[in-house]
Amino acid sequence: MAGSVAIVGIFVALLAVAGEAAVFTVVNQCPFTVWAASVPVGGGRQLNRGESWRITAPAGTTAARIWARTGCKFDASGRGSCRTGDCGGVLQCTGYGRAPNTLAEYALKQFNNLDFFDISLIDGFNVPMSFLPDGGSGCSRGPRCAVDVNARCPAELRQDGVCNNACPVFKKDEYCCVGSAANDCHPTNYSRYFKGQCPDAYSYPKDDATSTFTCPAGTNYKVVFCP
């Protein structure tokens, strides 16, 4: 009997976790093909214009990212390279992409049973993006970065036709909020450029107050490239 009770308890716990998993619908509305990437769950998939991809992430997933890769070529084994967002020369990503790339970031079922999510330009920008709750939870707010940041990118930040951030370009403490600037980091002229283009998005590592969004655990989400 004790064993049966334990099994039932485990089953109920698994159902509870599954009930708070999040489904991410990734949609490509760009007028070109992208190779969507998602870690630590999902891997990667080619998305032609108008195509979508559904990813289920379990409750408790942290340090997660979704992004678009562009200009990719892969062989039949899934090996190749991308002009932007490349993740080690493979279609199925297991690690983060190479800057510059626009990032959707999330952590599920964290403090106060909340999901935390954002769009980050700390690694630069390659395609416009929105990251919004996908109905049903009563949660409606999320970040949008729908402008073409590349169009007015400062010349010194331009790379491969897209726009890098100052941190990966100059690797200085004041741009990366590390070392001497770890506890006293402020916006710079470069981060202000990104913030002016996309007020909802992270423009530098300490940009939490205006760039972090929350929804109740169990919310589903939609990430749109070129909204």
From Swiss-Prot:
GO BP field: defense response; defense response to fungus; killing of cells of another organism
SUPFAM superfamilies with a match to the protein in the record: Osmotin, thaumatin-like protein
Domain of life: Eukaryota
Pfam families to which the protein is assigned, alphabetical: Thaumatin
Cleaved signal peptide residues: 1-20
Keywords, comma-separated and alphabetical: Antimicrobial, Disulfide bond, Fungicide, Plant defense, Signal
Disulfide bonds, paired cysteine numbers: 30-226, 72-82, 87-93, 139-215, 145-198, 153-163, 167-176, 177-185
Function: Has antifungal activity. Inhibits Candida albicans and Trichoderma reesei; marginal inhibition observed against Alternaria solani and Neurospora crassa.
Family statement: Belongs to the thaumatin family.
Protein name as annotated: Zeamatin
